[in-house]
From Swiss-Prot:
GO terms for biological process: ethylene biosynthetic process; fruit ripening. The keyword Oxidoreductase applies. This is 1-aminocyclopropane-1-carboxylate oxidase. Fe cation binds at residues 177, 179, 234. Residues 153-253 form the Fe2OG dioxygenase domain. Its cofactor is Fe cation. It comes from Prunus mume (Japanese apricot). Gene3D superfamilies: B-lactam Antibiotic, Isopenicillin N Synthase, Chain. It is an enzyme of class 1 (oxidoreductase). It holds the Pfam family 2OG-FeII_Oxy. Belongs to the iron/ascorbate-dependent oxidoreductase family. InterPro entries: DIOX_N, IPNS-like_FE2OG_OXY, IPNS-like_sf, Oxoglu/Fe-dep_dioxygenase_dom, Plant_2OG-oxidoreductases. Pathway: Alkene biosynthesis; ethylene biosynthesis via S-adenosyl-L-methionine; ethylene from S-adenosyl-L-methionine: step 2/2.
Amino acid sequence: MENFPIINLEGLNGEGRKATMEKIKDACENWGFFELVSHGIPTEFLDTVERLTKEHYRQCLEQRFKELVASKGLEAVKTEVNDMDWESTFYLRHLPKSNISEVPDLEDQYRNVMKEFALKLEKLAEQLLDLLCENLGLEKGYLKKAFYGTNGPTFGTKVSNYPPCPNPELIKGLRAHTDAGGLILLFQDDKVSGLQLLKDGQWIDVPPMRHSIVINLGDQLEVITNGKYRSVEHRVIAQTDGTRMSIASFYNPGSDAVIYPAPTLVEKEAEEKNQVYPKFVFEDYMKLYAGLKFQPKEPRFEAMKAVETNISLVPIATA
């Protein structure tokens, strides 16, 4: 079996650049996922993020989760649960406007650290989008502009903890899905595993590695590349031992951004056979996704194509 792609971003400097870019290209085309090491975010800083996130869970969220489990009788289930996930979560919004100062129960240090964390990940996301542009033969800045909308991209973080589960065979940590948005950057627990992706009909573990950032591609990048890159189904398997930390940051298009395949990536044959992905306003896709997240993505694309309107397309200026 092929090894899960692990990419050292330091390889972009010097003679290793071509090989590193080829690894990124292969990961985007064949996996939809890859793991970054030497990505430029200091390891000491990531240690602080992890420590404060786990402290916050223990102090503010753990008891609430136990009460939720008890109220729904989840510890005693005998049949598979298909309408809930075994996870404790909260959300932080960064762009276009941050809500970190308004989120309750966050210690000041944790609040400030997560603001800094968001800035570092935003910078990394935009660097990666330009690397994808380079591999796709698009102008530098094309993908960032494609995401822009009126007020810039949307960017937020889902902070999750997956506590020990007595019946992991009956309830998932997170049910299988593809991500609706653009580029996802995940800082995950390196001691407790659980994340899996679907490749060639097999569920494959995403290896937990200390201080790495896991990248996966969302549905919008599949549309913009007209299927050259694809979003991939993934899930979280609950574990009987240990609480798994997951901090997933989503660099997505602005709500009013018009998403459509980059013209240079639409081959003539695909156009003639009407094998071109739809164009739509990102917010409209998200409304559809909200009710269909845990279902296959293809019907979502078909539904958007069916209601496709004459949205005015203007060339994406990258200069």
